[in-house]
Every structure is written in C-alpha cells, then in structure tokens.
Amino acid sequence: SDGRNVAAKAFHRIGRTIRDECCSNPACRVNNPHVCRRR
C-alpha cells in the first residue's frame, strides 16, 4: 500500500499541473469541464 500511496501522490502532483494548464486554456476547459470544476 505504501507504493500505491506514493504513486497516488505523484499522480496528484502531475494532475494538478495538467489541470492548471488545461483550465487556463479556454478550449481545453470547455472540452474537460470536470477537470476545472472548483469546490
């Protein structure tokens, strides 16, 4: 489970970068509304 936790953290870090880039791109934001949803 430790390895899975490390992988999840790495994925989350990468995912946040992709999300930020996508959400700053109007076309990407329109095509991926679930990515840019803020709570």
Swiss-Prot record:
One of its GO terms (cellular component) is extracellular region. The modification 4-hydroxyproline is found at P33. It is found in: Secreted. PROSITE patterns: ALPHA_CONOTOXIN. Keywords: Acetylcholine receptor inhibiting toxin, Disulfide bond, Hydroxylation, Ion channel impairing toxin, Neurotoxin, Postsynaptic neurotoxin, Secreted, Toxin. GO terms for molecular function: acetylcholine receptor inhibitor activity; ion channel regulator activity; toxin activity. Residues 24-26 are annotated as: Ser-Xaa-Pro motif, crucial for potent interaction with nAChR. Residues 1-17 form a propeptide. Disulfide bonds join C22-C28, C23-C36. Expressed by the venom duct. It holds the Pfam family Toxin_8. The mutant ArIB[V30L,V35D] is a potent and selective competitive antagonist of rat and human alpha-7/CHRNA7 nAChRs, making it an attractive probe for this receptor subtype. Belongs to the conotoxin A superfamily. The cysteine framework is I (CC-C-C). Alpha4/7 pattern. This is Alpha-conotoxin ArIA.
